[in-house]
């Protein structure tokens, strides 16, 4: 036995990791994620969930939040915070039909505090500001159109991402089908979701209800992608498990498997760090689900259940050794990884505007700043997408860059859809390449973890960066992958950017430099806890040097490493804090 839990302590490969965290007790006692959520739903004295249920609703795809802009004012009035939930839908590969879109648009308008739909870096949508009386209605509305939110949060395999490449339609379809298969294979088998939210029949549970995840589920969240090179829009190195598509003559034949990526860290704790995924090797298609289960169960058994800050797969690999972890996966899957097939990641951005696929269909990628679909003054974006949904015969594809593709448009419908997009501010040639390559997480006012602004901070900050680029004579193609995240948990994927800002306190950020265009290098902290004004001053100096000293076609991140402005992070555990 390579692992055991005795006397509330965990031992892995002979090493005692310590006393189990309280989250392990919570999961053990939850009766396969049921807890007392149903009783909490009936309690209208508070708008929130209590005790363990605050954590358990995450496994059902929700986070309890409140509006931090009005928290102090409510406290003065002796009111509790305005508790509500954010829901993240399970949409493997990010494909949604026009009919589904119209239903979620209607729900967001009628039953959420903010009236918006938020496209996220997890290639799905989020509802923000749903009050307790509307939560069950929300789940039942989604269920009526074939959508759920099982396992989009919590210690489980989250929403499976898939490269959105509308040009390679046949290959994309194959990859998308695998994303769906992997999602279903790794999904919790508990009936708790249906019982609580869909008024399903109560069933007796047994120990083997969760053959892959186990009764206590995973030590920490787990993220999976299917990616088609050379496009790395899903950012493989932000994820625990990645299947890199290998094709011959346009047909998918297998995957290279990358394990152990992740970006979250904790300020001041050098045992936490962002980390690239390791390449385990190549597998044929028929072994995909076996390998997925083997990686997940190895992490289930070997991941740290004592310290949640060190519980993710990336830390397990660094603790036990990549070769040891890989050998265990081979043993459990009954395979031997072959040598990785050649591939290269060259880009991550979405191709904004129209492209034609090899199937003759047209695809329109709409740039949605920060993924926030809302009707702004003079730019009714949310209404615009709804109007397109009313006449669109194809589907929509949400991207991991928080944009939206109107996919599968016939030649006869193209002009009508473009007209609607332009009328509602969804197409704008004035959007710079810099803005298209900038991204932020939600942060304030809804995220309880946010230490600084991100989504609300980004638009003006990008305008300021555009001014700096222009000042130094750089043209529109000379842009920088720029990302802002309001805390070190990494939702905005700043730790794979050329310039990454990580929130430290209101108005203050850590400035990281040295990532690259393809998303294959982790940036390193350049300045700590500085203000927006100081950040812009630093960027001004750095961009000035880049403009004058760069090699032909040298991107900003590569330049900062080459000239020694920042040291390259090769092995995160060794280099990130060095």
Swiss-Prot record:
Reaction(s) catalysed (UniProt annotation): hydrogen sulfide + 3 NADP(+) + 3 H2O = sulfite + 3 NADPH + 4 H(+)
Metabolic or biological pathway, per its Swiss-Prot or TrEMBL entry: Sulfur metabolism; hydrogen sulfide biosynthesis; hydrogen sulfide from sulfite (NADPH route): step 1/1
PROSITE patterns from the UniProt entry: NIR_SIR
Presence of the UniProt keyword Iron-sulfur in the record: yes
Binding site for siroheme: 491
GO cellular component term of the entry, any: sulfite reductase complex (NADPH)
Cofactor or coenzyme needed: siroheme; [4Fe-4S] cluster
Positions that bind [4Fe-4S] cluster: 441, 447, 487, 491
Its EC number(s): 1.8.1.2
BP GO annotations: cysteine biosynthetic process; hydrogen sulfide biosynthetic process; sulfate assimilation
Any GO MF annotation of the entry: heme binding
Keywords: 4Fe-4S, Amino-acid biosynthesis, Cysteine biosynthesis, Heme, Iron, Iron-sulfur, Metal-binding, NADP, Oxidoreductase
Pfam families: NIR_SIR, NIR_SIR_ferr
EC class of the enzyme, as a word: oxidoreductase
Comment on bound cofactor: Binds 1 siroheme per subunit.
Gene3D superfamilies cross-referenced by the UniProt entry: Sulfite Reductase Hemoprotein, domain 1
Family (UniProt): Belongs to the nitrite and sulfite reductase 4Fe-4S domain family.
Subunit structure: Alpha(8)-beta(8). The alpha component is a flavoprotein, the beta component is a hemoprotein.
Xref: NCBIfam families: CysI, PRK13504.1
PANTHER family the UniProt entry points to: SULFITE REDUCTASE [NADPH] SUBUNIT BETA, SULFITE REDUCTASE [NADPH] SUBUNIT BETA-RELATED
Function: Component of the sulfite reductase complex that catalyzes the 6-electron reduction of sulfite to sulfide. This is one of several activities required for the biosynthesis of L-cysteine from sulfate.
The protein's name in its UniProt record: Sulfite reductase [NADPH] hemoprotein beta-component
Species: Vibrio vulnificus (strain YJ016)
